[in-house]
Amino acid sequence: MKREDLLTNVVDDLSLEDLRDLKNLEIIFDKVYGFSAENVVKAVEILRDLIKEADLRFLSFTANLVSTGLRGLLADLIRREYFNVVITTGGTIDHDIARSFGGKYYKGSFEFDDTMLKELEIHRLGNIFIPFENYGKVIEEVVRKYIPEIVSVRKDWSVYELLWEFGKRINDQHSILKACYEKKVPLIVPGVVDGSFGTNLFIVSQFNGLKIDLFQDMRLIKDLIFSSEKSGALIIGGGISKHHTIWWNQFKDGLDYAIYITTAQEYDGSLSGARPREAISWNKVRPSARSVTIYADATIILPILSASLLR
């Protein structure tokens, strides 16, 4: 099979406006009601109240979603100020920068010979195909191009302010970094070194004196938490982005609103599979909190929840 035969259909970004025809889906789910449909309806109700009543609103998600068309939707949710803090993983920066600077991702399939893909120099992320040259090379070039400019301003940076600097230099309305910069929404990435962007920062820092101060990000979250009256979170996926979100909320006696979208299960004791009720025992979610867990693929559920905000 030829490489060009696999790289034909580009992944496009979704916008909130694309979902306008779905805005009444919650009515359908309410009529269905049974089983998981009930939780979708609950999530819609909680999300609306979270946005209306919580002054501190977290959007937490994992990086794999940014390789899909959900990237543009996540950027829209930030740009429309539904959320004012974003917590994610290092790969989010990688995918957002790669796609913002011309790295095209392609529609592929789970069922492919990965040894063959490696020989064709194609990464596979689930059913997304990423040509080698559209990922690491792009990120490396962007970091090497802009870090000298940024370091000329100052050498010590928090992660969220450094990401704003990159967002300022992006000309792509579907970019999460750009949306965060425009709305001055802090993009908190506790695992920033776990990825291509962080590795490239480390490499260039050995030559130009760049210093990353994660404690500045922690001080920001601390100030936001202690000054908030109510907090809520839409948490998509698990891992470090989920835990960092609920961890900090324990210092205000827990989240007031919590919506989990996950495919992980709790039987193995993992953080990713833990439900909001377990977080109550850790003081990370209030006993009185309104919470719900939807067991589903976020690429299906997030558009439905987001569309409900258009009603």
UniProtKB/Swiss-Prot annotation:
This protein's record includes keyword Cell membrane: no
Disulphides: none
One Pfam family named in its UniProt record: DS
SUPFAM superfamilies named among the record's database cross-references: DHS-like NAD/FAD-binding domain
Positions of transmembrane segments: none
GO CC aspect terms: cytoplasm
Cofactor requirements of the protein: NAD(+)
Pathway stated in the Swiss-Prot or TrEMBL entry: Protein modification; eIF5A hypusination
Reaction equation(s) it catalyzes: [eIF5A protein]-L-lysine + spermidine = [eIF5A protein]-deoxyhypusine + propane-1,3-diamine
Coiled coil: none
Active site positions, chain numbering: 284
UniProt KW keywords: Hypusine biosynthesis, NAD, Transferase
EC annotation from Swiss-Prot or TrEMBL: 2.5.1.46
Any GO MF annotation of the entry: deoxyhypusine synthase activity
Role: Catalyzes the NAD-dependent oxidative cleavage of spermidine and the subsequent transfer of the butylamine moiety of spermidine to the epsilon-amino group of a specific lysine residue of the eIF-5A precursor protein to form the intermediate deoxyhypusine residue.
Family according to the record: Belongs to the deoxyhypusine synthase family.
Name by which UniProt lists this protein: Probable deoxyhypusine synthase
Organism: Sulfolobus acidocaldarius (strain ATCC 33909 / DSM 639 / JCM 8929 / NBRC 15157 / NCIMB 11770)
Gene name, Swiss-Prot/TrEMBL: dys
